[in-house]
């Protein structure tokens, strides 16, 4: 904001919301009866990840860590889809949990997802940080360009014209595959 003013956030946040809704729609249509899929829109990490933290604080007594999973879908607008294994600028948080294991397995063993890579995200964190720190299995998906950056993030060109529908569709398919493997 300080350098460029407000941006449209088509890539950052818009693609994540679209992917989350498309993923949930698919899962709701064909879901085991003992499973529940909910979509939580936290207000984005730009708000200090307070939405995710507040939701967790309000619901932590209802969460069974053995059967509660969080999939965060951030900027999936262009470039190559990645699953995040580490985050943090000053301190590192390792995401070592069941969802990351599933993402790693899918990217290595399922030919549809061989292009999906792991990522150590060194600039700040994602909404998943609160869940991971609480011992809840959490996975973040994001897309990165050839320089390891999230395309158009917080820039004036963060517009619908810079969204690659193929990248968004890949994120939807990968998210569904992660969830279905978890449910199997």
Which residues does each PLM region occupy?
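Acidic/histidine-rich catalytic neighborhood of metal-dependent amide-processing enzymes
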Residues: 2-95, 102, 113, 124-127
């Amino acid at each position: 904001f300080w350098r460029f003013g407000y941006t449209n956030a088509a890539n950052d946040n818009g693609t994540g919301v679209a992917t989350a809704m498309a993923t949930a729609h698919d899962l709701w249509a064909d879901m085991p009866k003992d499973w529940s899929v909910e979509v939580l829109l936290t207000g984005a990490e730009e708000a200090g990840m307070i939405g995710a933290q507040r939701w967790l604080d309000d619901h932590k007594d209802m969460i069974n860590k053995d059967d509660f999973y969080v999939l965060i879908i951030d900027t999936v607008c262009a470039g190559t889809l990645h699953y995040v294994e580490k985050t943090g600028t000053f301190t590192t948080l390792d995401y070592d949990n069941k969802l990351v294991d599933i993402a790693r397995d899918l990217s290595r063993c399922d030919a549809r997802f061989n292009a999906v890579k792991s990522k150590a995200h060194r600039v700040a964190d994602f909404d998943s940080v609160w869940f991971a720190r609480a011992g809840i299995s959490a996975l973040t998906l994001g897309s990165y360009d050839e320089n390891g950056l999230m395309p158009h993030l917080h820039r004036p060109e963060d517009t619908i014209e810079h969204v690659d529908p193929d990248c968004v569709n890949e994120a939807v398919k990968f998210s569904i595959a992660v969830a279905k493997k978890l449910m199997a």
